[in-house]
Amino acid sequence: SDTAFAIDGKGFFAVRGADGNTYYTRNGNLKFTLAANGGNMLATSDGLPVLDTQGRPIVLGSNYVMSNVTVSKDGSLCYPDAKNNPQPIGITIGVFQFNNGLERLADSLYQQTAASGQAINEARNNNVEKSSIIQGYLESSNVQVVDEMVNMIVAQRAYELNSKAITASDEMLQQANNLRR
């Protein structure tokens, strides 16, 4: 879809929680929902508003055609104005010094902690490696659990078979040594 975004890099989308706090996600399965003011708000599949580089929810006027919205690699959401000129709105991409320190709140929703360090807004800091946004893609696991379980069972059985073959070989050599005596 036009609002499916994958992040290539270490960044996270910044979103506003129901409690007013800022949280972070890599889930780029976004959609436009009706905002309180009647505009179209970019939100996660759970309805959390995606934030612009100023920390405000991204809301477009209700007169814009959402299928004409594009995203540049630097994270700018572009929509055509009345004269069909692209109007960019920056999407906040936050990076952390220590991603392992983030506190997981939900399936793909994280909160910064003292261990993760403060979020660094990529748009406002030139000293961080920039992430890029790829439109039309979603980030997903590259591991198929069922396939890997089958592979693990096959490997375990092969190991057992080899172990039994070595045990049988040892027993045969021991019997051969006993026959010499």
Named regions from a protein language model:
Residues 1-181:
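Amphipathic alpha-helical polymerization modules
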